[in-house]
Amino acid sequence: MKTNKIVFIFGPTAVGKSDILFHFPKGVAEVISVDSIQVYKEFDIASCKPSIELRSHIRHHLVDFLEPIYEYNLGIFYKESCKIIESLREQKKIPIFVGGSAFYFKHLKYGLPSAPPVSEKVRLYINNLFIKMGKDYLLEELRRVDFKRYESINQNDIYRIKRSLEVYYQTGIPISQFLQRENMFENIVAIGLRRPMDEMKSRIISRVKNMIDCGLLDEIKSLLGKGYDEKTPAFKGIGYREFLLWRSRPCYLLNDIINLIVKNSFLYVKRQMTFFNKLPNVLWFHPDDDLKNILDLIFV
């Protein structure tokens, strides 16, 4: 077993990533969570944090790491991950990154995107273009100056649209050229987990029902009672934000909110798989049928 390897285990929400961790041998590996909501303290149920039982079987990092009022971002994740990797390598343990945030996996592999600073003059110019001409105009301009970035970007992500144009107007170089990076770590084993979509839909429905049965409503009432609200970064997670909508629209029934969580979760699964399918050199497995192959790949 090579102890200098780094393992990625990724897949969409509810695919069964945590389930396979119970089969890992104790003491030879630790998990680094790649999740933008599990990182927050107190937001437990809808984020589907690993159970106490699982965390006693294999240590998890970046779970219950941050207070809910603070923004979690790629920079924090990357910095903390590098420290954890270094520590685990000193202990001759395997770092295993587990989660569903494809954006974080991508930049852990290739490094943080680097682009030059932009002057306030250029920033104001692009923002004024957005105010006067709208998002579609900026998208068309991005298509003209950096088609590669235009094809890859979420076309509703106005922050990254503006940022891409700012870099181009500042330097005359497409931001896509700045984002091309070499692998930051050697010997990465990338394991993808997937199931048929009808199976995923059924698992999502069961998961949401289990959230309600486990006391999600009481957890949200408690969080609101502590002063957290829609401005709290942790409330952006699926399963939390829908209940904030319910609070502002009392005409909604509980079943409407449950159905909305299921719908949003399934749409998120589709977006996750679209992103994951673009990652190179991934070994894909069904988490139930291929467990032995997964274990051999990591630990043999």
From Swiss-Prot:
> What one GO molecular function would you report for this record?
ATP binding
What Enzyme Commission number(s) appear in the record? 2.5.1.75
The protein's matches in Gene3D superfamilies, at most eight in alphabetical order, are given as: 1.10.20.140, P-loop containing nucleotide triphosphate hydrolases
User: What GO biological process terms does the UniProt entry carry, in alphabetical order?
Assistant: tRNA modification
* Keyword vocabulary terms for this entry: ATP-binding, Magnesium, Nucleotide-binding, Transferase, tRNA processing
Residues binding ATP are: G11, P12, T13, A14, V15, G16, K17, S18
Chain spans, region Interaction with substrate tRNA: 35-38
**Cofactor(s) named in the record:** Mg(2+)
List the residues marked with site Interaction with substrate tRNA.
Answer: S101, R123
Which positions does UniProt annotate for substrate binding? T13, A14, V15, G16, K17, S18
* Catalytic function, reaction form: adenosine(37) in tRNA + dimethylallyl diphosphate = N(6)-dimethylallyladenosine(37) in tRNA + diphosphate
- Supply the Pfam families for this chain: IPPT
Q: Cite the InterPro entries for this sequence.
A: Dimethylallyltransferase, IPT, P-loop_NTPase
**What family, per the record?**
Belongs to the IPP transferase family.
NCBIfam families under this entry?
miaA
Give the function comment from the record: Catalyzes the transfer of a dimethylallyl group onto the adenine at position 37 in tRNAs that read codons beginning with uridine, leading to the formation of N6-(dimethylallyl)adenosine (i(6)A).
Subunit structure, as described in the record: Monomer.
Q: What name does this protein carry?
A: tRNA dimethylallyltransferase
Species for this entry: Borrelia duttonii (strain Ly)
Q: Which gene encodes it?
A: miaA
